[in-house]
């Protein structure tokens, strides 16, 4: 430090520490999506069942925010997902006219999603039909790739139901440094507190793929 031998390294390592903190937050953010899938079932919503379930209990019965039969992303599965979203009900069993807003996918599905969401005609068929998903504006905000999703064939649709997925930032990121009396080294640390969860599972629809 005295001869500026490690000045550049110190700057590089503090940036690496910030990058590590950011990466950790992204990994934690997608855990509910990955762990809440039907066969994984390691993340439950407040009603006691997995985040993505065909039988979320209500006062009047149940509602679902996943396909009855899991399927890979294609025209049929996307259309059925949007139909199921539109059939969501509230606690009393009344239709709430929910709509899909944005699709979240892993990087492995970005080319499939581009064809499904941008083609004017139907994909994978010789029929001269329009792409109903595009022409009806069924997913107005399109799709976004999340590179931290580890299930390569799962896809998710955010709905227009408020208070769905939640993040609480309990303590903002802070950094500190101090010198070590014995060695003369300089130590750096970073700390923040946050949590991720769900208030209303109607806010997201998830499909596991096959």
What kind of region is each of these model predictions?
Residues 1-41, 103, 188-190:
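Long, contiguous amphipathic alpha-helices that act as assembly "spine/axial" helices in icosahedral shell
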Residues 35-57:
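Charge-rich, acidic-biased intrinsically disordered regions
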């Amino acid at each position: 430090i005295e001869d500026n031998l490690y000045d550049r390294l110190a700057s590089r390592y503090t940036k690496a520490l910030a990058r590590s903190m950011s990466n950790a937050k992204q990994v934690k953010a997608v855990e509910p999506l990955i762990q809440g899938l039907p066969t994984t079932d390691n993340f439950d919503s407040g009603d006691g069942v997995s985040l993505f379930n065909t039988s979320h209990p209500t006062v009047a019965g149940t509602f679902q925010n996943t396909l009855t039969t899991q399927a890979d992303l294609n025209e049929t599965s996307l259309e059925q997902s949007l139909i199921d979203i539109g059939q969501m009900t509230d606690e009393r069993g009344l239709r709430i006219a929910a709509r899909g807003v944005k699709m979240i996918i892993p990087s492995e599905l970005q080319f499939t999603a581009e064809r499904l969401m941008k083609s004017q005609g139907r994909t994978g068929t010789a029929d001269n039909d329009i792409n109903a998903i595009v022409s009806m504006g069924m997913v107005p905000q399109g799709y976004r790739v999340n590179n931290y999703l580890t299930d390569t064939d799962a896809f998710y649709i955010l709905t227009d139901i408020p208070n769905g997925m939640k993040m609480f930032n309990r303590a903002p990121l802070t950094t500190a440094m101090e010198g070590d009396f014995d060695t003369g080294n300089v130590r750096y640390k970073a700390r923040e507190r946050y949590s991720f969860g769900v208030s209303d599972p109607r806010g997201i629809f998830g499909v596991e793929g096959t």
